[in-house]
Amino acid sequence: MEVEEAFQAVGEMGIYQMYLCFLLAVLLQLYVATEAILIALVGATPSYHWDLAELLPNQSHGNQSAGEDQAFGDWLLTANGSEIHKHVHFSSSFTSIASEWFLIANRSYKVSAASSFFFSGVFVGVISFGQLSDRFGRKKVYLTGFALDILFAIANGFSPSYEFFAVTRFLVGMMNGGMSLVAFVLLNECVGTAYWALAGSIGGLFFAVGIAQYALLGYFIRSWRTLAILVNLQGTVVFLLSLFIPESPRWLYSQGRLSEAEEALYLIAKRNRKLKCTFSLTHPANRSCRETGSFLDLFRYRVLLGHTLILMFIWFVCSLVYYGLTLSAGDLGGSIYANLALSGLIEIPSYPLCIYLINQKWFGRKRTLSAFLCLGGLACLIVMFLPEKKDTGVFAVVNSHSLSLLGKLTISAAFNIVYIYTSELYPTVIRNVGLGTCSMFSRVGGIIAPFIPSLKYVQWSLPFIVFGATGLTSGLLSLLLPETLNSPLLETFSDLQVYSYRRLGEEALSLQALDPQQCVDKESSLGSESEEEEEFYDADEETQMIK
């Protein structure tokens, strides 16, 4: 039997898969979220003052906001460490890299730069780890990246200088982004396809909870070095537990390592208490073994090319709008810890809604993704029609702040869906490469996002126009993708040989290779059960849709 049939025998979501969900979608995501937003508290700037009389004895007191601030910034550039320690005093009850290395005034850009280094590392990690895990296996690459992630993260807490901190943040980003991506794929490949949406949504939900958890830890641990080190205790526990999980049976199957795939499946069956389960994996005669994918394969086949270009844009927009709305919301005032917790908790309602909608036949993955993207885009576009001053009446409720919160809720939902949707659109042999490439473009959106709020100086609603236009465009483009709800999971490129789909009323398009040498037989007559569903066919016989 094939691997999908084997999962029906061993259990698609048994006791052991529930444990894997708890490990890789709950505990791991709590840790991943902590590292991803570490700079929010570690890089926060405490309140401070300087000895104005000593620094600027001739400065007029009446020109404080303009002249004195500029003079103080100029002085920081030339003053040595001992002078800064003598004249600058932090009054807050917590420490950070800003207070330790005086990253204030003209030096404050270094805090943002450290955050950029982290996401630059994630940019590198998501694409490189995807290819490595497709070639060497999910578990090996996941564990290696996880161990290095913890090592570099602990090194953050012992940083002797800003430069060392920035370098280790880049390395943490590379390992954190890469290993979490591989863990997501590993988890999905250990459960039945019907439960992919649930597993993915749980991960997104607990990433949001992880933000609130980090705020709580920061409230009690006010030393940035202690905080940066202690948050890795949770990661260490997850790493030790991960040593005993199996390799992905789907990856082993796609590589032709049938005996090892059977061992992994029998382990799952044993932990699911299905001791009498027996099966033997076989490959169809037409399927080549040890098939591997590369980055170029995403653009070699016409179907994969179309999917990849649309998905890259959607991932880019999700990241751009998510981080852009967060930055343009402004300072809420009050406790930094309460604000950070709220920024995570506000995302939580979107996840149960996602789990419900994407599993409904009348909505599915495609329509739900499109609806959330379009709703978020429209919410942002409405801002351009609102008055800039809105203190009374209906505008006290319907304003840029409330609409941006709605936008963040919807984009959080879309981000969760696109993760699940993307993993279902690519075959196993290239799934990590596809996810890594799309995730890479989301990091580009995250890098650009901080610059969008500054457009308010041109026109106050211009940032929302950018977010709304890109969100609405990506929502419409998502309708060009096929539905994957209850569809058989693609394993290898041969599963794409006679793969067809309908696109906006056009006739079905069979797979074609851009390279003439890669062209496959296109003479099979294809059909579709409905205009709303897509079918996957094996090269020799039709594989029925899973209802």
UniProtKB/Swiss-Prot annotation:
Inhibited by gamma-aminobutyric acid and drugs including quinidine and levofloxacin. Residues 529-547 have a biased composition (Acidic residues). Glycans are attached at N58, N63, N80, N106. The keyword Nuclease does not apply. Pfam families: Sugar_tr. It is a multi-pass membrane protein. InterPro entries: MFS_dom, MFS_sugar_transport-like, MFS_trans_sf. Expressed at highest levels in kidney and brain. Expressed at high levels in skeletal muscle, heart, liver, placenta and white blood cells. Expressed at moderate levels in lung and spleen. Expressed at low levels in thymus, small intestine and colon. Expressed in several intestinal tumor cell lines. The chain crosses the membrane at residues 22-42, 111-131, 141-161, 165-187, 201-221, 226-246, 303-323, 338-358, 368-388, 401-420, 433-453, 462-482. Organic zwitterion/cation transporter with apparent specificity for amino acids and their derivatives. Has low affinity for its substrates and may regulate their flux across the plasma membrane at high substrate concentrations. Bidirectionally transports carnitine and acetylcarnitine, possibly regulating their cytosolic abundance and further fatty acid catabolism via beta oxidation. Displays high transport activity toward zwitterionic substrates such as glycine betaine and diet-derived ergothioneine and carnosine. This is Solute carrier family 22 member 15.
